[in-house]
Amino acid sequence: MQKSKMFFEDFEVGLVIKTGSKKITKKEIISFAKNYDPQDFHIDENKAKKGPFGTLVSSGFMTLGISFTQFFETGVVKETSMGAWGIDELRWTYPVYPDNELKSEVKV
């Protein structure tokens, strides 16, 4: 059972926390990438057409940040967070395009 305020010992293996969704805009993709991941396929529509995805795509680091924000906004650890210790394994298996909608499922 998901509580609104959870401590480390409250997280049980198999627990799934679902988040709300967020639509990713072209403007957000370009703005984030210009500051933090300035690869052509994130910041320039014309150059992106010649890139590996054939169009503009979001930075994986942007999608990671959005996923974390979505989890935090569930309120589960808002009052109990002690910071993040790190990520052992992370893979971006699909590109995120402008106007895609992202939602997250966090599984313990």
State each model region's role.
Residues 1-86:
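Hot-dog-fold acyl-thioester-processing enzymes
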